[in-house]
């Protein structure tokens, strides 16, 4: 009985550890009002340990971080997405090229204007890839929703 219990416990712990390794990026999404009917959308990635997330202009080889937004007639996008964080640029052994990426944390900021005073949402998907010194995980698509406007 003890062997079965210990075996089950080890399998559960290994599965938990593997799940943590396979999801080294946590995303948060917020909207910050900066003027009347004008907001900044903050799509913030917190990156675990020695992993790094590639920039929107990642360089040759790695999959860059991209955002795709669902059309919303109440939202007008103003400019390009800005990256706020410590951008690193170095030779990437995984791709044998110079790459641009972020470790620890990066905030992707998109300015939007709301065409009405009623609350609405911005929906989209972020596609990203993470690597460490030994391996890369396949690119992932993560859908998100950000509440914007209203009172």
Please report, for each region that a protein language model flagged, where it lies by residue.
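Sec-dependent N-terminal signal peptides
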Residues: 4-13
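Extracellular/lumen-exposed scaffold segments
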Residues: 18-151
């Amino acid at each position: 009985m003890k062997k079965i219990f210990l075996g089950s416990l080890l399998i559960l712990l290994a599965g938990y550890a593997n799940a943590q390794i396979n999801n080294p990026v946590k995303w948060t999404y917020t909207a910050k009002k900066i003027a009347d009917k004008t907001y900044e959308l903050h799509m913030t990635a917190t990156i675990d340990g020695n992993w790094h997330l590639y920039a929107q202009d990642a360089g040759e080889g790695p999959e860059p971080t991209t955002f795709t937004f669902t059309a919303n007639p109440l939202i007008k996008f103003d400019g390009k997405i800005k990256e706020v964080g410590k951008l690193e640029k170095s030779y990437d052994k995984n791709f044998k090229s110079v790459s641009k990426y972020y470790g620890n944390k990066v905030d992707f900021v998109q300015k939007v204007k709301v065409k009405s005073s009623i609350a609405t949402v911005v929906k989209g998907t972020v596609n990203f890839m993470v690597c460490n010194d030994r391996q890369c995980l396949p690119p992932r698509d993560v859908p998100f929703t950000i509440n914007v406007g209203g009172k």
